[in-house]
A protein has these predicted regions:
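Conserved catalytic core of nucleotide polymerization and phosphodiester-bond processing enzymes
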Residues: 1-127
Length: 127
C-alpha cells in the first residue's frame, strides 16, 4: 500500500490509497498527489495506509460472502432472503438442503485454513 498505493483482496478486488499527507505529525487533510505537493511540499506520504491490513481482511471476507451468495443461487436455485455481515439467511425445505448450503459456503473460496460455517434451523427467524 505504501509503495504502489494499492492492495488486492483475496479475489483480486482493488483497494486504492490515492491520497497524500505530510510526513510531519499533526492534523492535516489528505489530498490528491498534485494538490498535496503544492500544499505540503515534497515531504509527503500516502495517507491511510495503516488501514491496509483491515481493508485486506474485511474486503476478502466480503468477497467470500458475495461469492457464497452467487454459488448458493447457481448450485441450488435458492435466493438468500438477507445477508448480514458474513451470514446468509435462507428458507430451506429440510436439514439436507441446509447442509448443502453449508458445504457450498465452506468451499466457495479455496483457503489454506478452511472456513467453518454454522447452521441454525427454525420455523421462523425468531427461533
Amino acid at each position: 500500500a505504501n509503495t504502489k498505493g494499492i492492495i488486492r483482496t483475496l479475489l483480486g478486488r482493488k483497494c486504492r490509497f490515492d491520497l497524500w499527507e505530510p510526513t510531519q505529525w499533526g492534523v492535516h487533510k489528505a489530498l490528491p498527489l498534485n494538490q498535496a505537493k503544492v500544499e505540503y511540499g515534497d515531504a509527503i506520504k500516502r495517507a491511510g495506509t495503516y488501514k491496509a491490513l483491515n481493508r485486506l481482511i474485511q474486503g476478502s471476507a466480503a468477497d467470500q460472502t458475495k461469492k457464497a451468495m452467487v454459488d448458493v443461487y447457481e448450485q441450488t436455485g435458492i435466493v438468500p432472503h438477507i445477508q448480514v455481515h458474513d451470514e446468509l439467511d435462507c428458507s430451506v425445505k429440510d436439514e439436507k438442503q441446509a447442509k448443502e448450503i453449508q458445504q457450498i459456503m465452506e468451499t466457495c473460496v479455496e483457503l489454506e485454513v478452511p472456513s467453518k460455517v454454522d447452521i441454525d434451523l427454525g420455523e421462523s427467524w425468531g427461533q
